[in-house]
């Protein structure tokens, strides 16, 4: 597969396909023409010795300091080196790769004044899978993701660390190995690389992909639990959900009916009891609301993936050109979206933990043994798996605190409101990792409960899932180190998203 970039039409589905295949990036000719035109504007500014922020002046509080024309390129190199203040663990390889794609895509809109050499260097790094090592901490989310993107830029100029073919190396060594020159930044290009929201947006894209997948995975896991508790099928009838008219809720109900079709373990209203608890009866309403959040997040991310979020921005109208200092680098729209994503994923974990509690609690699980123990008393069974799930969902409640309302002033009060969008992105991904483990715990417990109930009664679709996951997690016939089972299932759930990941 080839991913064609034009600065206008990039989607999350394209990104997902790119990550699943050994894809290459190609650039549409019209986009390259826009790059050339915007660069010509920068060259005219230099030739005419105009005063334009970030091209002929310093940055931030130093925006009124005029730079000597002989030092324009040095200014850009200094910018990258001084702003590379990222700290902590690096972003994943997937996030770093998507970050480069997004930065390239925004340059192709033709409002940043980048050279074709910069564009081609980014394309080269992407296609050769030279992955910059980019620390996660250090961004305020306005003026964009300065610190993370500076580490990306360091790799392009041969001064950063990269992962190449599974090894951590100096980018200069990799470029030499591939007979490629480090990029020599020209006027405006350092700013064009780091003024933007690509760190938070790239992490947001990966988080969205994994969150959506968790939403679908949670349905078949819930269907296993539903059958193990002889859940009532009537609550999923189409007419119940059609009268509320939330499409995502309607869709979840339809998928739950599909997962449960043919089961002899489900029951009808008043057959055993009149109503189920909310965590079974309200799966379409709860999960559907999470999908509503995911759809909003996707919309915001795709707007930003195709946005010009540099500063200043270069425009051409008729025969006139002008350069405007604005604030498109401010990450507030993405910060809000990613804070919402945290809520949607946290609720999937919350309701999963409550379902698995019903499977192990002898007061709630019908005729199943306490904690599904093979020998109650001597064997503890799934007792502490529920503890672990409770710990994770409680941690998520702390992580779900909105980062986007926690502004702090910076740059001598010039940058006096920031988005903290990258913090929202980082915390959001930790919530996803936690939620995946909670669902893995529910899966391990639901597999055992279904076995005790009699797998011959499972619906055909959930029976296939049972057989698939029993190859990973054996029956609980005695107490063992269940953390190994939980991590094995969590990893398997994640690998189903990135079956053949392009950056590995």
Curated annotation (Swiss-Prot):
Pathway stated in the Swiss-Prot or TrEMBL entry: Amino-acid degradation; L-histidine degradation into L-glutamate; N-formimidoyl-L-glutamate from L-histidine: step 1/3
Keywords: Cytoplasm, Histidine metabolism, Lyase
Entry-linked CDD domains: PAL-HAL
Catalytic activity of the protein: L-histidine = trans-urocanate + NH4(+)
Protein name: Histidine ammonia-lyase
Recorded name of the encoding gene: hutH
GO molecular function annotation: histidine ammonia-lyase activity
Highest taxon in the source lineage: Bacteria
Any one annotated GO CC term: cytoplasm
């Amino acid at each position: 597969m080839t991913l064609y970039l034009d600065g206008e039409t990039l989607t999350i589905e394209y990104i997902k396909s790119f990550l699943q295949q050994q894809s290459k990036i190609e650039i549409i000719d019209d986009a390259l023409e826009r790059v050339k035109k915007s660069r010509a504007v920068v060259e005219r500014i230099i030739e005419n010795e105009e005063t334009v922020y970030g091209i002929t002046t310093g940055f931030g509080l130093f925006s009124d300091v005029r730079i000597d024309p002989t030092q324009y390129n040095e200014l850009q190199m200094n910018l990258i080196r001084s702003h590379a203040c990222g700290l902590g663990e690096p972003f994943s390889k997937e996030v770093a790769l998507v970050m480069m794609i997004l930065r390239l895509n925004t340059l192709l809109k033709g409002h940043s004044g980048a050279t074709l050499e910069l564009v081609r260097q980014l394309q080269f790094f992407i296609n050769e899978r030279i992955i910059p090592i980019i620390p996660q901490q250090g961004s305020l989310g306005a003026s964009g993701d300065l610190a993370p993107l500076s580490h990306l830029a360091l790799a392009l100029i041969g001064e950063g660390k990269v992962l190449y073919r599974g090894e951590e190396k100096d980018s200069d060594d990799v470029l030499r190995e591939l007979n490629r020159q480090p990029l020599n930044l020209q006027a405006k290009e350092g700013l064009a690389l780091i003024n933007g929201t690509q760190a938070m947006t790239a992490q947001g894209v990966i988080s969205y992909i994994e969150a959506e997948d968790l939403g679908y995975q949670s349905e078949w896991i819930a269907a296993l639990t539903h059958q193990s508790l002889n859940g009532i099928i009537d609550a999923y009838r189409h007419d119940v959900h059609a009268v509320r008219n939330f499409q995502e809720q309607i869709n979840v109900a339809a998928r739950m009916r599909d997962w449960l079709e043919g089961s002899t373990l489900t029951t009808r209203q008043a057959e055993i009891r009149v109503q189920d608890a909310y965590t079974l009866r309200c799966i379409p309403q709860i999960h559907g609301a999470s999908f509503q959040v995911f759809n909003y997040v996707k919309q915001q991310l795709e707007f930003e993936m195709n946005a010009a979020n540099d500063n200043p921005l270069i425009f051409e109208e008729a025969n006139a050109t002008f350069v405007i200092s604005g604030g498109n680098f401010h990450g507030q729209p993405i910060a809000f979206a990613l804070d919402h994503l945290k809520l949607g994923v946290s609720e999937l974990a919350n309701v999963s933990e409550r379902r698995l509690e019903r499977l192990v609690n002898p007061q709630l699980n019908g005729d199943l043994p306490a904690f599904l123990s093979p020998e109650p008393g001597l064997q503890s069974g799934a007792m502490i798996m529920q503890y672990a799930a409770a710990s994770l969902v409680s941690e998520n409640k702390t992580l779900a605190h909105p980062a986007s309302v926690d502004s702090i002033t910076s740059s001598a009060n010039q940058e006096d409101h920031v988005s903290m969008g990258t913090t929202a992105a980082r915390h959001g991904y930790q919530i996803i990792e936690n939620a995946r483990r909670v669902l893995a715990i529910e899966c391990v417990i639901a597999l055992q409960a279904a076995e005790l109930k009699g797998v011959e009664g499972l619906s055909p679709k959930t029976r296939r899932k049972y057989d698939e996951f029993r190859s990973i997690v054996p029956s609980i016939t005695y107490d063992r180190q269940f953390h190994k089972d939980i991590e094995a299932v969590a990893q398997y759930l994640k690998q189903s998203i990135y079956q053949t990941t392009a950056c590995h």
